[in-house]
């Protein structure tokens, strides 16, 4: 998993509450277990018309936001089913950080496991960031996980809280496998000692 220390990029505004995982990645895209290629299906029902043509009015289709790295979204983001394809689709599109006032628990934890930083802020701060994100290509925001600060286009900063263990994993690029490998020396030492003390096992 790629490390997350500091991210600077365009923030896209999505002021919609209760965006569920079905909206993030529709069921038609769930037939694969690959993590790549799902970016085309991200918000597909909003990004494309029924005939498959691009909906130019959807925020991520607008030229200023096509390479957005940060999503500023409404309350209760990621609710609904627990499909892990949702963070996969966000990541494959290029989104590495989602900022909202709240997240569904399963989606929130899945983000950390896949290298996406979900940040919870107050309603007041979300409104400030949403205003910043309306600036199009000038909506450049920096998210610093080391200092736990979000810096807007005008230089103003917002602090955010995050679980220390999750922060450690993101800063060091550790998913579940990486966490296990981090303890590989201790595991090897235990196995050696265990084999010596219990040769019959």
Swiss-Prot record:
- Which InterPro entries does this chain map to? 3-IsopropMal_deHydase_ssu, Aconitase/3IPM_dehydase_swvl, AconitaseA/IPMdHydase_ssu_swvl, IPMI_Swivel, LeuD
CDD domains (UniProt xref): IPMI_Swivel
The entry lists its GO molecular-function terms as:
3-isopropylmalate dehydratase activity
Biological processes per GO annotation: L-leucine biosynthetic process
> Which Pfam families does the record match to this protein?
Aconitase_C
Q: What is its EC number?
A: 4.2.1.33
**Keywords in UniProt for this one?**
Amino-acid biosynthesis, Branched-chain amino acid biosynthesis, Leucine biosynthesis, Lyase
Q: Which GO terms describe its cellular component?
A: 3-isopropylmalate dehydratase complex
Associated pathway = Amino-acid biosynthesis; L-leucine biosynthesis; L-leucine from 3-methyl-2-oxobutanoate: step 2/4
Q: Which SUPFAM superfamilies match?
A: LeuD/IlvD-like (SSF52016)
* Catalytic class of the enzyme: lyase
Q: Which reaction does it catalyse?
A: (2R,3S)-3-isopropylmalate = (2S)-2-isopropylmalate
| HAMAP family on file | LeuD_type1
The UniProt entry's sequence similarity note says: Belongs to the LeuD family. LeuD type 1 subfamily.
Function as written in the Swiss-Prot or TrEMBL entry:
Catalyzes the isomerization between 2-isopropylmalate and 3-isopropylmalate, via the formation of 2-isopropylmaleate.
Q: How does it assemble?
A: Heterodimer of LeuC and LeuD.
Question: What name goes with this protein?
Answer: 3-isopropylmalate dehydratase small subunit
Organism in which the protein naturally occurs: Allorhizobium ampelinum (strain ATCC BAA-846 / DSM 112012 / S4)
